[in-house]
């Protein structure tokens, strides 16, 4: 349809241009015949016609350029975009586990907050407190420091109660006289009484003492070579010869000569 309308507009402009040509030729003929008044009126009308035609053509070309620049059909954004709250029909096991764990963590945190608000009563039994201690130790890591007593001396640390939401001071039962709150605190205090962990001292094994054995002193006697050659079953006479000095042997040898 747009091409057909442009073709019709082009035909009308062409016809108007031809008519203006014929009009100019007629005005020139009248000017030759000295008809000035008629020529002036005709020129003014021709000028008005040309101006209007130029304005019309300019508007047509501007409209055609804008129509070519703009797309004919705008894309719909709602068809391409998905809704934000869209839930997939397939509910996988991983999603179920993640939601289940998140629900458990929120319920445990709510229970711990309820425990902190019950700072003075503690009407629930001890089994529930122990179960909550175990759950809190398995899920929520705590980074709280032990409370400081007003006297300035800190109680010994109990390594089992690091993850508790609140630690209670030890209250002796002798001070409670008819107070239910004090008796409950006394019972919990007895359960939570700070017990010092046994200190393990590593004793070093004593080194074995090394005693030096006394060495036997051996006395070496000088003996002559003649005494070594004599047999063992000799009588006392040869033993005297063994113990005799070498000077005695030299004297005997001289007498024999």
From Swiss-Prot:
Residues 187-198 are annotated as: Binding to host heparan sulfate. Keywords: Disulfide bond, Glycoprotein, Host cell membrane, Host membrane, Host-virus interaction, Membrane, Secreted, Transmembrane, Transmembrane helix, Viral attachment to host cell, Viral immunoevasion, Virion, Virus entry into host cell. The keyword Transmembrane helix applies. Disulfide bonds join 173-186, 176-182. It comes from the Viruses. Residues 204-222 have a biased composition (Basic residues). Glycans are attached at residues 72, 80, 85, 87, 92, 105, 139, 163, 199, 215, 233, 251, 253. The keyword Disulfide bond applies. The chain crosses the membrane at residues 38-66. One of its GO terms (cellular component) is membrane. Residues 1-37 are cytoplasmic. InterPro entries: G_prot. It holds the Pfam family Glycoprotein_G. Residues 70-92, 118-166, 204-257 are annotated as: Disordered. The record marks 65-66 as: Cleavage. GO terms for biological process: symbiont entry into host cell; virion attachment to host cell. Residues 73-90, 150-166, 231-243 have a biased composition (Polar residues). Residues 67-257 are extracellular. Belongs to the pneumoviruses glycoprotein G family. This is Major surface glycoprotein G. It comes from Bovine respiratory syncytial virus (strain Rb94) (BRS). The gene is G.
